[in-house]
Amino acid sequence: MSGRLDFNFGSRVYPSWFVGTALGLLVGVAGCSKEATPIAPSSSPLGQEPAQALKLPGLSYWNERRAEGPWSIHVVKIDRSRQDLRLRTTIARNTVLGLSSLSQQIRNVPASAGKVVAAINGDFYVVDQSPYQGDPRGLQILAGEVVSSPGDQVAFWIDAAGEPHAEHVDSKMTVALPDGATFSIRVNEERGPRGIVLYTPRLGPSTRTVGGKEYVLDREGSGPWLPLEPAKTYTAKVMDIREGGNASLKGDHLILSAAPRVAGLNDVAVGSVVKISTATAPDLPGVQVAIGGGNIMVRGGKLQEFQMPSSGAYKYRSVLERHPRSAIGFNATHIFLVEVDGRQPDLSIGMTLRELGQYMRGLGCVEAMNFDGGGSSTLWVDGRVVNSPSNGGERDIGNALVIVRTPTTETK
């Protein structure tokens, strides 16, 4: 396709290559199971856990086959009462930028975090060969660290009290200058022509920007510092100012990067003290895990309606088309990871978002949202990929959500 199309997601404008489901690119070569077991018999009620489901402590998995699609649906059901099961996000290559398969991201989870027992692909991301390939579209918090700021969209997270949420999250992140002026900022993303972005060492070796001014920040005083956490204020001193972009990200320094068209920072000099706020709406104090996604499908136990698209662009029409899908849902007792295979007429044709929402509600979810789908849709359980990715193998993706088992004295 020639030229460049832009999709407008909230307050951000993203090129057509941004949506991982839009193009059949980046196909991995890892092995996948075409005939994952156990399989729920078609005579059982839709969404009901079969007697032969794979049982692990606190977790069950099954593959439900339905002739009426046909559909092949993979479900992981997690007991929320288990103190030894934790959710965690991953990123490719342990940096914001770059892509790797779900299996590779699982291998990169540190042993200290626990043993991964299940995982699913995560947010939409930059898929093309740009300097920011792999950048997640929305919010991501990894072990308490903000690695990507909200993109004015839906996210899933676990609050400090252990309660799951799936709802819209807005960025309220700012930098306050010595003269009192305040500017909105984003974290670890491509800088727009009038944007200000805060880059952390988690991005990669350098900011990859072109032009503008970049302010090297170091800790000032005894307040909080890296890793960057949500719902906090950081006091920083300007140690250096670099022209031209692509500043190195070294040690525990931050880089505040201003595009050439940004006005109002001319009085910021070496030695100036600025304040960085990582506020969001809703606020996320103490959150250890968060990941962005797509539409809310079930809210308060009610199926959400999806309007007929006013545009023929893929972003809009894909909502009403059948594609491979990935989703997360929950109720008072369980969290569900669901993957629906698609684009394989003899196995599974995929689902619309409404069909997926109906299925999630049938599982008992009172809240449910979808993740990136299409060729990205991948579910991993107990050491292997259990679904049949539509491209014939694992696609390299930007991030993922994993379930880890941690050491505990609990013996349930």
Report the location of each language-model feature.
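N-terminal secretory signal peptides that target proteins for export/translocation
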Residues: 1-15
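Intrinsic disorder/low-complexity segments in short proteins, especially the signal peptide
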Residues: 10-12, 28-31
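Intrinsically disordered and other compositionally biased segments
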Residues: 12, 25, 98-101
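Bacterial N-terminal signal peptides
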Residues: 16-28
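Gly/Ser/Thr/Pro-rich low-complexity, intrinsically disordered segments
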Residues: 32-412
